[in-house]
Amino acid sequence: KYWDVMNEPEFKMFFKGSKEDFIEIFNFSSKVIKEKQPDAVIVMAGAAGMFPENKKYWKSVLPKIKDHFDIANIHHISGPDGQCDGELWVDEFAALLKSVNVDKPIWVTEAMTCGPPVKAWVKAFVNGAELIIDVGVNAPGPKMSKKGRKQLNEFINEYDGFTSIKSISKKQVEFTYKDGSKKILEF
């Protein structure tokens, strides 16, 4: 049911074509998938972060593909130098989507943190992420500490399944669930 069409096309190591080639392939693929599977959910090709060159690429491409996907997709992988963004790029990605009139759910389908993982995930959710997929322990690059991994697993076990999240202070968020119950997290 879920189709992730292509991967990080702004990186030549994944896609050798031009922007126009990507747009044509993406839109055609999405159209064929929807024709063959009407209930399919198309996930946008993952944007490889929000570095200036990535933003420039997606600012020109998004208006031409926005009618051909259901879920916007951002990746956050730490570079070899360990550089990362505190909200897993979700704040900047949400602003970019808004700037080109794209109003779609945001998924982070490759999440690697380099700081406290729970704090990064909470900030990403507060900034609009609907779903975050951890790249796991076998991903290349810097590894999450055992303590961070334990904290992230505990966070997921305790707070998964929420329907909304809001900041109630600089270090507190409130999760709301389908049954109306609420949980507060201090981080």
Language-model segments: residues:
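Aromatic- and carboxylate-lined catalytic core of secreted/periplasmic carbohydrate-active enzymes
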Residues: 113-187
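Secondary-structure transition/hinge residues
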Residues: 37, 101, 157-160
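Active-site cleft segment of glycoside hydrolase catalytic domains centered on the general acid/base Glu
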Residues: 1-69, 75-95, 99, 115-122
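Short, structured coil segments at secondary-structure junctions
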Residues: 68, 102, 127-128
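Active-site neighborhood of phospho(di)ester-bond hydrolases with catalytic His/Asp-centered motifs
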Residues: 73, 107-110
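Generic beta-sheet signal
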Residues: 45, 109, 134-135
